[in-house]
Curated annotation (Swiss-Prot):
The lineage of its organism: Eukaryota, Metazoa, Chordata, Craniata, Vertebrata. It is found in: Cytoplasm, Cytosol; Nucleus; Secreted, Extracellular exosome. The keyword Phosphoprotein applies. Keywords: Acetylation, Apoptosis, Chaperone, Chromatin regulator, Cytoplasm, Differentiation, Immunity, Nucleus, Phosphoprotein, Repeat, Secreted, Spermatogenesis, Transport. Ricin can induce a cleavage by the caspase CASP3. The released C-terminal peptide induces apoptosis. Component of the BAG6/BAT3 complex, also named BAT3 complex, at least composed of BAG6, UBL4A and GET4/TRC35. Interacts with GET4; the interaction is direct and localizes BAG6 in the cytosol. Interacts with UBL4A; the interaction is direct and required for UBL4A protein stability. Interacts with AIFM1. Interacts with HSPA2. Interacts with CTCFL. Interacts with p300/EP300. Interacts (via ubiquitin-like domain) with RNF126; required for BAG6-dependent ubiquitination of proteins mislocalized to the cytosol. Residues 977-986 have a biased composition (Basic and acidic residues). The modification N-acetylmethionine is found at residue 1. This is Large proline-rich protein BAG6. ATP-independent molecular chaperone preventing the aggregation of misfolded and hydrophobic patches-containing proteins. Functions as part of a cytosolic protein quality control complex, the BAG6/BAT3 complex, which maintains these client proteins in a soluble state and participates in their proper delivery to the endoplasmic reticulum or alternatively can promote their sorting to the proteasome where they undergo degradation. The BAG6/BAT3 complex is involved in the post-translational delivery of tail-anchored/type II transmembrane proteins to the endoplasmic reticulum membrane. Residues 236-650 are annotated as: 4 X 29 AA approximate repeats. Its main location: cytoplasm. The gene is Bag6. A motif (Nuclear localization site) lies at residues 1026-1068. Gene3D superfamilies: Phosphatidylinositol 3-kinase Catalytic Subunit, Chain A, domain 1. It comes from Rattus norvegicus (Rat).
Length: 1146
């Protein structure tokens, strides 16, 4: 009930406070309360209005959490906005919360011993109560036709979408009743009660659903919501569903037939009750609706100047009736899809003729940017059907003829409700015909589970999936494989398959014998490349942009696999993805990640021949998943071929979110690379070239199945599509090969970012970076990160010319010239190396500066010699190998010099990133350093370079110096004045090469612990962070830093200064620009090919002499005066102060 009854009294008190409360759904509510009310009383006062129990509320004002025992007046919140967030449930409550009796599909998954632990809150407004949400289906046709991919917002439980529809309608009816009560009791409402009623957030999903439904007349009544808001509010409907019966007994029922979950579906009588209640509400609303029409009819001309009270009353009526109409319309839409098939045998129940995605707008999250802060437990849907599912009622009933029926959540529910312990073949036939192969991706945050189905129809997986009949309940080959890992054993621990991929049978029987199958792969027809590329591009691209990410956990799921031999066929051990580049979710992680893999214990499964002839499309698709999602085995060719990565998620584990991008990094994909330690200059090539696997050929993929198995053109098309999805919000054109330089220049609006010689890009490394960015597109970079060296091969002429001109200064590429140029170049990095290691503890006796400089000289000497001498077709592969080798050895060397302390090495890298990123968005820098730390840990855990390989580079204090070349080049002076060499060197390029190591060794352990430690560290840094939901922390921190930090502004123009008040102009002008004579001379000498007679240092000292500076000042003044006299475009009227600045008298 609204707290308005007490607030009207509070308004009469002389010392009342008007407090604005803003919730996570961006709604602001106004409360007028007594000034002496304490915070705890205020929480209880607003609990009903905000739908959050008082004990779970956290009120934040000016970065501080309001304490319960203090008074509101003490915080001076009168007329101010207080932010309200909901406290995350304690970790100890997670398992019990998962067993809440709210009626979701896993209500009893914890064994059912604690059904009432949540207390009354579970049936009230506990948004953290357990709920399942169906994310939809994705069908891949076998005829090569295009596949349309949509991102939709959808709320539908795996258990029963009709039930959710009724529950949502009941919630909305209660909301309408609340609104009617407020209109009928006018005196007990607040002055500004125009905000949505207490329960309105529960209908956000329906509101979103209406937005894209052009055929529904009530569309106009559903105001569009922001994706963030709608996602957050979508989680509530199923959490407040006391009507849903516990699904504990369900598992026993589903075994006989897939439709045995019918008891969870609502009966027609329940639908009738809801409709009757709607009729009563309409009768109650009628008088207010008439008054509403009267007010609106006269609204254009009514004069409220002297009738403030009347205006308030009319405005209040308009708001409340409008909100009631919105809820009423949404209720009708939710109920309009419910049908009862009278042809079915009794007892009949309701089903849904069209899924919620029917109403939603495709690509809802297209505008989402990275990093995304999300609310734990949000719902995101990905659906895409090669053929539209028939809306007929029979489709939901899993009729044998409905090949697309699986796209409807109800029929999907039949899949997930079947139990692992149901060996009888009886239940198999119905789903066998209605479900093609399924790839399921599920997400669990706290308790809600998000799932996605990808249905891959091959020529033999239609109703004719008879070959799989021997597998009993498994249905068609592909479908059965996904069935085995679905929610088997509700009573014990309902598990969800994160990803299940049916495997070609001949590839699975012998894991080590996988390589022979590569021939079939290479011989597979490429007719469906376009379709596959389009499908995977949209799928991966949209997954990378979604806030909802894959959750992984591990129960003891071996029995599930054992009960389904064909399922075991698809169960290769899944490498635990490295949780690095999930910017969208790093802030939302609320607990540790328990990840494990289940290997099919039934060896007979792989040998089963049910799906005898996998199509070429299937083979290509499975290998493509291997490339993108990472091979499933530690190196066996079989898993690499089929890539059936399966991970089981358990609801009881603490909350964790990991990005779909982690699958791109699993064992072969390319993760965002950690930058090399600041010293290494050879990184210029590595900046973009570092591929994951050993650069020579396609060894990045285990089992001998290199990237060549898939045509580079096909891989390129997939990458192009993924990047188009990711960069579409930044204006990137589809299919565009825009260079990185052009892309950044277009976003920044500056034309000189990558021009050689421009500010911030001086020196050799800056020019090299410019060359790479001007010639490489985003697609080229991703190709390099995945081990394809073709972009480097294409760049060979430009690189060779560049090194000849900028590196050798036009001299002959002899060994002595190369060594001398390398020495000069690397020596210029000494100050950056010293600065980078100044704050870390180095091993006693080790000369870290010399160690790095001499190591870099040797590595870069090899790279430069290769670029200048190699002319054959192995240029790209060898260059890639040199960069990878240099990176790994550099990391191993510095780790050894730092005593094996990974934290010290990470501090060196992150310190350099922060120094290079001054003025950059702090949240982006924070994300970058966190991501680099995670990736660095993965790289170091699978380091292919041993200590013995790098000991020869270690230099001790007192060791004799290395023999120096005869004469350093003049480039050294320019290098010392520019921070760019280090910037290039410290760029996050080569980290992705860890994939090579990961493919050689066992799958990496999950990095959840590391992420949690970092989250904890960031929370400790700010006292308020512990009381704020994780997704709010980066937002608040960014606001704090942006208020503290003022970006440097460019110098003001003369015209601007002339219009400024004199007093302010004096304070703004300062001493004028700094004279950079030494820089100008170095640049001119380099352009002319001249070199100083002495050393660059002595030249710099000479140029800094006062008399030289004064002469330079006079010469500069004279040049400007001459320019002002001769330039026809100069106008003294436009620049009135120019004569004073550059007059003859200083």
């Amino acid at each position: 009930m609204e707290p308005s009854d007490s607030t009207s009294t509070a308004m009469e008190e002389p010392d009342s406070l008007e407090v604005l409360v803003k919730t996570l759904d961006s709604q602001t509510r106004t409360f007028i309360v007594g000034a002496q009310m304490n915070v705890k009383e205020f929480k209880e006062h607003i609990a009903a209005s905000v739908s959050i129990p008082s004990e779970k509320q956290r009120l934040i004002y000016q970065g501080r959490v309001l304490q319960d025992d203090k008074k509101l007046q003490d915080y001076n919140v009168g007329g101010k906005v207080i932010h309200l967030v909901e406290r995350a449930p304690p970790q100890t409550q997670l398992p019990s919360g998962a067993s809440s009796g709210t009626g979701s599909a896993s209500a009893t998954h914890g064994g059912g011993p604690l059904p009432g632990t949540r207390g009354p809150g579970a049936s009230g407004h506990d948004r953290n109560a357990n709920s399942y949400v169906m994310v939809g289906t994705f069908n891949l046709p076998s005829d090569g036709s295009a596949v349309d991919v949509h991102i939709n917002m959808e709320q539908a439980p795996i258990q029963s979408e009709p039930r959710v529809r009724l529950v949502m309608a009941q919630h909305m009816i209660r909301d309408i009743q609340t609104l009617l009560s407020r209109m009928e009791c006018r005196g007990g409402t607040q002055a500004q009660a125009s905000q949505p009623p207490p329960q309105t957030p529960t209908v956000a999903s329906e509101t979103v659903a209406l937005n894209s439904q052009t055929s529904e007349p009530v569309e106009s009544e559903a105001p569009p919501r922001e994706p963030m808001e709608s996602e957050e509010m979508e989680e509530r409907p199923p959490t407040q569903t006391p009507e849903l019966p516990p699904s504990g007994p369900a598992p026993a029922g589903p075994a006989p037939a897939p439709e045995t979950n019918a008891p969870n579906h609502p009966s027609p009588a329940e639908h009738v009750e809801v409709l009757q209640e709607l009729q009563r509400l309409q009768r109650r609303l009628q008088p207010f609706l008439q008054r509403y029409c009267e007010v609106l009819g006269a609204a254009a001309t009514t004069d409220y100047n002297n009738n403030h009270e009347g205006r308030e009353e009319d405005q209040r009526l308009i708001n409340l009736v409008g909100e009631s109409l919105r809820l009423l319309g949404n209720t009708f839409v939710a109920l309009s899809d419910l049908r009862c098939n009278l042809a079915c045998a009794p007892p009949r129940h309701l089903h849904v003729v069209r899924p919620m995605s029917h109403y939603t707008t495709p690509m809802v999250l297209q505008q989402a940017a990275i990093p995304i802060q999300i609310n734990v437990g949000t719902t995101v849907t990905m659906t895409g059907n090669g053929a539209r599912p028939p809306p007929a009622p029979g489709a939901e009933a899993a009729s044998p003829g409905s090949g697309q029926a699986s796209s409807l959540p109800p029929s999907s529910a039949t899949v997930d409700s079947s139990t692992e312990g149901a060996p009888p073949p009886g239940p198999a036939p119905p789903p066998a015909t209605s479900h093609p192969r399924v790839i399921r991706i599920s997400h669990q945050s706290v308790e809600p589970v998000v799932m996605m189905h990808m249905n891959i129809q091959d020529s033999g997986a239609q109703p004719g999936g008879v070959p799989s009949a021997p597998t009993g309940p498994l249905g068609p080959p592909g479908h059965g494989q996904s069935l085995g890992q679905q929610v088997p054993g509700f009573p014990t621990a309902p598990t969800r398959v994160v990803i299940a991929r049916p495997t070609p049978p001949q590839a699975r029987p012998s894991h080590p014998g996988g390589p022979p199958v590569s021939g079939a792969l290479q011989g597979a027809g490429l007719g469906t490349n376009t379709s596959l590329a389009q499908m995977v591009s949209g799928l991966v691209g949209q997954l990378l942009m979604q806030p909802v990410l894959v959750a992984q956990g591990t129960p003891g799921m071996a029995p599930a696999s054992a009960s389904a031999p064909a399922t075991a066929q698809a169960q290769a051990p899944a490498p635990a993805p490295a949780p690095a580049p999930a910017p969208a979710t790093a802030s939302a992680s609320a607990g540790t990640t328990n990840t494990a893999t289940t290997a099919g214990p039934a060896p007979g499964g792989p040998a089963q021949p049910p799906p005898p002839q996998p199509s070429a499309a299937d083979l290509q698709f499975s290998q493509l998943l291997g490339n993108l999602l990472g091979p499933a085995g530690p190196g066996a060719g079989g898993p690499s071929l089929a890539s059936p990565t399966i991970t089981v998620a358990v609801p009881g584990v603490p909350a964790f979110l990991q990005g779909m991008t982690e699958f791109l990094q699993a064992s072969q994909a390319a993760p965002p690379p950690p930058p090399p330690p600041p010293p290494p200059p050879p990184a210029p090539e590595q900046q973009t070239t570092p591929p994951p696997g050993s650069p020579s050929g396609g060894t990045a993929s285990p089992g001998g199945l290199g990237p060549e198995s898939l045509p580079p053109e096909f891989f390129t098309s997939v990458v192009q599509g993924v990047l188009s999805s990711l960069l579409g919000s930044l204006g990137a054109r589809a299919g565009s090969s825009e260079s990185i330089a052009a892309f950044i220049q277009r976003l920044s609006g500056s034309s000189n970012i990558f021009e050689p010689g421009a500010d911030g890009a001086l020196g050799f490394f800056g020019a090299l970076l410019s060359l790479l960015c001007q010639n490489f597109s985003m697609v080229d970079v991703v190709m390099l990160l995945h081990g394809h060296f073709q972009p480097l091969q294409r760049l060979q002429p430009q690189l060779r010319s560049f090194f000849h001109q900028h590196y050798l200064g036009g001299q002959e590429p002899t060994s002595s010239n190369i060594r001398m140029a390398t020495h000069t170049l690397i020596t210029g990095l000494e100050e950056y190396v010293r600065e980078s290691f100044s704050l870390v503890q180095v091993q006693p006796g080790v000369d870290i500066i010399r160690t790095n400089l001499e190591f870099l000289q040797e590595q870069f000497n090899s790279i430069a010699a290769h670029v200048l001498h190699c002319t054959d077709s192995g240029f790209g592969a060898r260059l890639l190998e040199l960069c990878n080798q240099g990176l790994f050895e550099c990391l191993a060397l510095n780790l050894h010099c730092l005593g094996g302390q990974q934290m010290e090495l990470a501090a060196v890298i992150n310190g350099r990133i922060r120094r290079m990123s001054r003025g950059v968005n702090p949240s982006l820098v924070s994300w970058l350093t966190t991501m680099m730390g995670l990736r660095l840990q993965v790289v170091l855990e699978h380091m292919p370079v041993g200590p013995d390989a790098i000991l020869r580079y270690v230099r001790r204090i007192g060791d004799p110096p290395q023999a120096l070349p005869e004469e350093p080049m003049e480039v050294q002076g320019a290098e010392r004045t520019s921070p760019e060499p280090q910037r290039e060197d410290a760029s996050p390029a080569p980290g992705t090469t860890a994939e090579e190591a990961m493919s050689r060794g066992p799958p990496p352990a999950p990095e959840g612990g590391s992420r949690d430690e970092q989250d904890g560290a960031s929370a400790d840094a700010e006292p308020w962070a512990a009381a704020v939901p994780p997704e709010w922390v980066p937002i608040i921190q960014q606001d704090i830093q942006s208020q503290r930090k003022v970006k440097p502004q460019p110098p003001l123009s003369d015209a601007y200064l002339s219009g400024m008040p004199a007093k302010r102009r004096k304070t703004m002008q300062g001493e004028g620009p700094q004279l950079l004579l030494s820089e100008a001379v170095s640049r001119a000498a380099k352009a002319a090919g001249a070199r100083p007679l002495t050393s660059p240092e002595s030249l710099s000292r000479d140029l800094e002499a006062p008399e030289v500076q004064e002469s330079y000042r006079q010469q500069l003044r004279s040049d400007i005066q001459k320019r002002l006299q001769e330039d026809p475009n100069y106008s003294p009227q436009r620049f009135p102060n120019a004569h004073r600045a550059f007059a003859d008298d200083p």
